[in-house]
């Protein structure tokens, strides 16, 4: 039983703009979705858990099918999925669920089109004895431990003094493993923080 991490997948039938904006190397959203499902199912077994740290789906007002088709991609994934809501899920909550996180969560957990094990605003995980805070926006990072986040896609880079961006664009569209996170933490402590101090 392993844990995996990603963010900013932006699944949904009308999500072509994300492919264009982020230069994702896929001809269309169908090819992108099919490849992501293949990668996730290749990496994560049915006993594993994938933490999606926001923006699993795309949501724009007046495109209700977009976020619903995006959430439905969860049915194609073999592993357990825990969704930390991002700004796109929050938009869906505000527009389609009367601003109620609980209604959105209930939809994700109980609607036959979805397969999520839980939906949370944020969470903590323990990775090999190190505590990490999971939240979508890096501006909401924890003060008492490292944070795994998304939201900035590739534009904010892989790491910050307070944690790591696990966005799909930063790992060749693959999931980050516990070992990946611990490797980055080791590099950060040994080199990256030192480099930052030298170059500031």
What are these regions (language model features)?
Residues 1-4:
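Extreme N-terminal starter segment of soluble prokaryotic enzymes
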Residues 6, 11-121:
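Core catalytic region of metal-dependent phosphoesterases/phosphodiesterases
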Residues 99-199:
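Conserved beta-sheet core of the metallophosphoesterase superfamily
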């Amino acid at each position: 039983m392993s844990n995996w991490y990603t963010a900013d997948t932006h699944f949904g039938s009308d999500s072509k703009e994300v492919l264009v904006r982020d230069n994702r190397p896929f001809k269309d959203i169908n090819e992108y979705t099919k490849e992501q499902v293949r990668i996730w199912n290749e990496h994560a077994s049915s006993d594993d858990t994938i933490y999606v740290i926001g923006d699993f789906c795309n949501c724009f007002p007046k495109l209700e099918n977009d976020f619903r088709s995006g959430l439905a991609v969860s049915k194609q994934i073999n592993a357990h999925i825990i969704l930390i809501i991002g700004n796109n899920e929050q938009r869906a909550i505000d527009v389609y669920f009367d601003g109620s996180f609980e209604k959105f969560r209930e939809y994700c957990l109980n609607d036959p089109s979805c397969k999520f094990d839980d939906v949370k605003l944020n969470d903590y995980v323990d990775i090999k004895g190190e505590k990490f805070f999971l939240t979508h926006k890096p501006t909401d990072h924890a003060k008492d431990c490292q944070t795994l986040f998304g939201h900035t896609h590739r534009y904010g880079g892989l790491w910050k003094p307070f944690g790591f961006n696990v966005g799909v664009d930063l790992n060749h569209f693959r999931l980050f493993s516990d070992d990946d996170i611990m490797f980055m933490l080791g590099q950060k402590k040994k080199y990256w923080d030192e480099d930052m101090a030298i170059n500031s």
